[in-house]
Amino acid sequence: MSCVHYKFSSKLNYDTVTFDGLHISLCDLKKQIMGREKLKAADCDLQITNAQTKEEYTDDNALIPKNSSVIVRRIPIGGVKSTSKTYVISRTEPAMATTKAIDDSSASISLAQLTKTANLAEANASEEDKIKAMMSQSGHEYDPINYMKKPLGPPPPSYTCFRCGKPGHYIKNCPTNGDKNFESGPRIKKSTGIPRSFMMEVKDPNMKGAMLTNTGKYAIPTIDAEAYAIGKKEKPPFLPEEPSSSSEEDDPIPDELLCLICKDIMTDAVVIPCCGNSYCDECIRTALLESDEHTCPTCHQNDVSPDALIANKFLRQAVNNFKNETGYTKRLRKQLPPPPPPIPPPRPLIQRNLQPLMRSPISRQQDPLMIPVTSSSTHPAPSISSLTSNQSSLAPPVSGNPSSAPAPVPDITATVSISVHSEKSDGPFRDSDNKILPAAALASEHSKGTSSIAITALMEEKGYQVPVLGTPSLLGQSLLHGQLIPTTGPVRINTARPGGGRPGWEHSNKLGYLVSPPQQIRRGERSCYRSINRGRHHSERSQRTQGPSLPATPVFVPVPPPPLYPPPPHTLPLPPGVPPPQFSPQFPPGQPPPAGYSVPPPGFPPAPANLSTPWVSSGVQTAHSNTIPTTQAPPLSREEFYREQRRLKEEEKKKSKLDEFTNDFAKELMEYKKIQKERRRSFSRSKSPYSGSSYSRSSYTYSKSRSGSTRSRSYSRSFSRSHSRSYSRSPPYPRRGRGKSRNYRSRSRSHGYHRSRSRSPPYRRYHSRSRSPQAFRGQSPNKRNVPQGETEREYFNRYREVPPPYDMKAYYGRSVDFRDPFEKERYREWERKYREWYEKYYKGYAAGAQPRPSANRENFSPERFLPLNIRNSPFTRGRREDYVGGQSHRSRNIGSNYPEKLSARDGHNQKDNTKSKEKESENAPGDGKGNKHKKHRKRRKGEESEGFLNPELLETSRKSREPTGVEENKTDSLFVLPSRDDATPVRDEPMDAESITFKSVSEKDKRERDKPKAKGDKTKRKNDGSAVSKKENIVKPAKGPQEKVDGERERSPRSEPPIKKAKEETPKTDNTKSSSSSQKDEKITGTPRKAHSKSAKEHQETKPVKEEKVKKDYSKDVKSEKLTTKEEKAKKPNEKNKPLDNKGEKRKRKTEEKGVDKDFESSSMKISKLEVTEIVKPSPKRKMEPDTEKMDRTPEKDKISLSAPAKKIKLNRETGKKIGSTENISNTKEPSEKLESTSSKVKQEKVKGKVRRKVTGTEGSSSTLVDYTSTSSTGGSPVRKSEEKTDTKRTVIKTMEEYNNDNTAPAEDVIIMIQVPQSKWDKDDFESEEEDVKSTQPISSVGKPASVIKNVSTKPSNIVKYPEKESEPSEKIQKFTKDVSHEIIQHEVKSSKNSASSEKGKTKDRDYSVLEKENPEKRKNSTQPEKESNLDRLNEQGNFKSLSQSSKEARTSDKHDSTRASSNKDFTPNRDKKTDYDTREYSSSKRRDEKNELTRRKDSPSRNKDSASGQKNKPREERDLPKKGTGDSKKSNSSPSRDRKPHDHKATYDTKRPNEETKSVDKNPCKDREKHVLEARNNKESSGNKLLYILNPPETQVEKEQITGQIDKSTVKPKPQLSHSSRLSSDLTRETDEAAFEPDYNESDSESNVSVKEEESSGNISKDLKDKIVEKAKESLDTAAVVQVGISRNQSHSSPSVSPSRSHSPSGSQTRSHSSSASSAESQDSKKKKKKKEKKKHKKHKKHKKHKKHAGTEVELEKSQKHKHKKKKSKKNKDKEKEKEKDDQKVKSVTV
């Protein structure tokens, strides 16, 4: 910037004027100076004189050069003679003072003059001046000052003066410039740029806004003309406006969105725990803090801590939706606060309307909600009076039910009706319908009842919800008082809420769509409908599902104020109004769920409140989530939802009855809504044969996130959005029992009912799946039992036209089988009606408000109530850790991915639940724990039969939850469950402290209770029924242990929140996944709604297996849980990454599985069996049980797996966590996963990514999990191997069950192969790796997990199969097998870990293998007794692998063809697997004989297989690492830490291995061939892991059964699981005890153990074979890489990874290398064939899974029992392996 310095002559200092250019004109300088000095041109003129030359500038155009100094004088305008002598005398003075002295002034002209001199050469100036003048002159035209020439001369003819408007002169020359009297006419703008079509001509140029067009005519924009015609007042932009009739009256803020305190739209809506009402966070905190005793402004309960406030995410979402839709600004609404109180009554009206619409009984039920309406809107006097009566009873509790106060009669029925009617008339909905009227009535009530209604609204929000509670008071005002009587009443209250719910739609309307009365009617009705769907349907459904709980749903969010009836504050926040009210009904009055609810129902209501508007779940959903979710809390949510929604809902009524209902009422409401949302999303994601696809479609918006992330998360969103969309979805939903729930999902709002009714049990499950639904579910377990069934059912019918679904009792108490055509049809009809209604009135609102609430609901309700501990990050999975039973569910939603993932899982689980429900309804009668448990058990069995592990899981969790939480901690547990489930997702800020408090108290207590109860339930369920009890027992034990672990986690997080929570927070995301998996299982047993919600999606497939595993693992988990906490911590990070993979793979698999689902349904049972076997394998006990159970459930599981690979993964992950505690389970599970991989290889990959990641993350804590998933079998990526090394510390020697049994916390020492060490260092290492691996793992996992899983699958699957047939012996064997498997897993894990870090170990392993070659002799002698059992186990495992990869006979022949046979075997095995699969189903005895035969054959091959598996493990880990990194290159790099040595060794040993392989083939043809087959299979699996796994599981299960026969024989002996199935029969004994563990370590180190074990059995041949294997592995790597590239990049990575890993890990890769070399040539063909076969087997796998599910359940108990035995033996081996693993870990840490 140039500048000129000026100073007034009277001043001493110069000021500066800056300008652009080299010069500034005098005119401009004057203007600038005058401007700077604030002088006015009219006052004076300025005289500018050059300070150096004393030259006075007179010409305005004179240019003053920059940096000049001038002196300024003020002179009169006329001008004055210069008083200074600086006039132009002076050309004598130098222009620049700096140059010539002033002495020379006479001789030189000033520079200023010089610059104007044309002839500088002759000028009288110094050369410097001349130069400067020349420079100035030359640059003058370029001076910016001169850029724009001043207009000179006449302007162009078209130019008109801007002042006078006349042409001929510029404005500066305008003759009127001096004329002060001249007033220029109004300037007419030109319509430049405005299309003529947008303009309308006007004749009057003076018309406002008239513009001159280019045609010379005047026109104004059409829109302006319209606006002018309307005559809008133009107000200052920021002046507070009075509520305009158009905006305020047309789109009044829904009452549910109004804060009861400030009467304005809620900002940062929070739910107060006492009464479930929602307020602005600031308002309620201020009110509480300003009151002396922290008195609730609505229910006047004292000591309500502001920290207990739960963020009402649903309501917040509703508010956001409302604001977005209406452009509402709080300022405007501030004057609307009075209406809010009236609005609460309208909400009951809406509910009432809805209920009448839905069904009159519900309307009556809605009466409690109606009570507020009574006072608010008196027009429907009769209705109001009845409502008032009912509400009166509630109103007193409300203590602020002015409207209901008039008729504080406890006649809820009357109240509801009145409320509905009055609100109807009041609300804008009046236009649309009585239902619609509520909105109108609401609006009118707003205006007329502002004071009284304001109070009423406030009271309704406070007292209304209390009335909702009061309705429970119908059911028992105690419920209203917080006692939440487990009767239909509470649900009715919610139902009554529906009367209030009318405002609900209206409020939903207002909430989300407050746009205009018509819109409100349209939207409001839709909103109300949606609210009803969300709130009431949620509530009712939830209530239905939860039984009475759902009646609160009628209060459902649609009538936020009525919803307030449960929690008055929730009136506004309860846009749907129901959730908070429901919460209130459950918690608000006397018995806020503070104790029961970690975060009281309000916690739920807050989130529900937010979602409430969109869902009517804000309050209702919250209430649902909290209230109903407990009822629905059973993690059966998905499958149960699908299969047994009605039955489960009825069961929920039965199970929790009133207590559960009351406690879980709000939770269930919220959770139910969430579940609805999630279900819708989850359905789509699930793409299960069940309405999964429908679900996802309905909630497609959420489907994306669900698919991408955890089901629960997107599920929650889906819930909210899906609610509105779900209507269209409903047809798909009805596909299963859950189909109804799907349809139900279609009616997002209506969801509540459905949920309550069909899903209450599933809801529990679903609760775990979805945050919000979890909230519902949390209560669902309780609510489920609530008698609301009938009313709710009616209400449900009204909305759904499915009386049973509406009837909570009918739904819960009496198992309403959605499979029942009539029930299904009723539900569909109701759904159709509801959809129509919803679409008519609520769709817009649902679309806007619901979608977000869905996520919020899921997250909010489940997680919100999750104790803060778990919910450090409300939506992180971390919470799930704390959710032992219910928080896991939340965590599912939470788990970062999991909010969606849970959603996805929830969707899957819901789908599965539908099936599970249906099947479980069939099997409902025999439940271990009372009706609920029986139903859950039966549902689980039904689910197993149906092939849904998720249903079982949900059922299990529900059972566990309900039995443990409901029966033992009926209120507390339920509350805790709701709180966990609801608090975590919903709890935003307020819930944190209280959440922690509640969690520490209730959740911790619950977990503690659940721990004993889980254990007690274990025994209880065991006593309750061998099969059912076993299933449940296993689930229960899992819950107990896991809950204990979760309790520990919970406590840990509390006691060490910074450290543990920080740890858990990162892991929590994973742990929320893994925890939501583990805890999903835990919560499946305990409060698995949320975990199920999240995990359900991931684990839909995994869940069936996982459930069983969890059942088995739960026994183990009791001991293992503590480690599992660590493991889960580690796992959580892994899981975090894995869920991503899981999502991708899940989607992949879902797509594949969805397509395959139905095709596989028949074969699903077979494959399911295998998959279950595989999954169960990780924990032989569990596997045994899951074998049966999974055989039954495998179809379902397969469906789940196929539909929800992530779920399966999650199950695996969670089981993996547990298995992480017990590597045996890990081993078992890996086979299971392999088997499952067959059906869901991608899923397996996800699981592996996740499970492995779990192992990685939780390797320290539960490395076994990873092991079983990725390296458990024998294939672990270097990451895995590192993890496994850490795991080796735990030395999976301790089975999960062992670990669980050792719940005392043998974690550090026992490390139980849970590999707690890895949790610590591997966790971080692997977390980062896992993230990389997760990105690559889906690819690598596809291949690797397949090989690993396949091998493991083969081993444990056989074991599992054996358990199926001989559950007890099998379980023993399985236990041993688990131990062995655990060892193997740990060794393999170590191998995997050591594959990179212990590739050193490879040399070491070679030494090991040499040693173990020698040792085999010794061990053979030492462990000959175990040899047979181990042989059987190894045979079982190996044969299982062989069978899973090929028929045993085919494999035997293929084995003989060692190298060539491997590819052929791989191909035949796949076919044979199918054959064996069929054979297995048709001739299990034959299979057993075959198994014995093949076992003998495979005794050596089994070891080889294990070695191959170990190699696979390593390669898999290498793959994992490569996946982490870049795939194969990273395999080399990552694996280099672990596998590089193997690579180097491989180079050396590759030749050796082929030689050894030849020797091994010579010496042990079977063994070598088995190895080759294994290797080939591994390669094939790598390349075609999916297909292979699919094929393998069937065959594996056939093998299992055959091997089971063998194991039956050897069952007594199997001490440790065949740590390496590939060990020879001679080695089997050894490996059973010491050898097994040592080899595990070796394998863990660099899979040396596998090869060592093989070497033990093969002797030096093993070593040679190892080298051969290395060579072949390299060969196979190349071929596998090529083949896998052909197969898929994932598989390509996986296969090459497997092969290189095999090559890389000579020790661990010995056998694997054999397989690799064997399969190297055949790898391409094998992999291709395997892929095809696996696809085929995928289908079969599902069937087998279904069959196995049933068998697995029964076997699970035995497995759990055997796990204890195994634990003992595993402990011994564990100590040995610990030492080895420590060494390996050291190596691994070095390599890492």
Swiss-Prot record:
The keyword Transferase applies. Residues 1433-1544 are annotated as: Interaction with p53. Residues 336-347, 557-601 have a biased composition (Pro residues). This is E3 ubiquitin-protein ligase RBBP6. Residues 621-634, 1258-1276, 1436-1447, 1618-1627 have a biased composition (Polar residues). Residues 374-393, 685-719, 1692-1723 have a biased composition (Low complexity). Residues 982-1139 are annotated as: Interaction with RB1. GO terms for cellular component: centrosome; chromosome; cytosol; nuclear speck; nucleolus; nucleus; protein-containing complex. A zinc finger (CCHC-type) spans 159-176. It catalyses: S-ubiquitinyl-[E2 ubiquitin-conjugating enzyme]-L-cysteine + [acceptor protein]-L-lysine = [E2 ubiquitin-conjugating enzyme]-L-cysteine + N(6)-ubiquitinyl-[acceptor protein]-L-lysine. Residues 645-675, 790-799, 902-922, 955-971, 979-990, 1001-1017, 1041-1071, 1095-1161, 1182-1200, 1230-1248, 1280-1290, 1362-1391, 1399-1435, 1448-1459, 1468-1506, 1514-1580, 1751-1760, 1774-1792 have a biased composition (Basic and acidic residues). Highly expressed in the placenta and testis. Expressed at lower levels in the brain, heart, kidney, liver and lung. Overexpressed in esophageal cancer. Contains a N-terminus DWNN domain, a zinc-finger domain and a C4C4 zinc-binding RING finger domain. The ring finger may indeed be a U-box domain. Residues 735-770, 931-940, 1727-1750, 1761-1773 have a biased composition (Basic residues). The modification Phosphoserine is found at residues 244-247, 360, 516, 768, 770, 772, 780, 815, 861, 873, 957, 1179, 1221, 1277, 1328, 1341, 1347, 1646, 1648, 1651. The keyword Hydrolase does not apply.
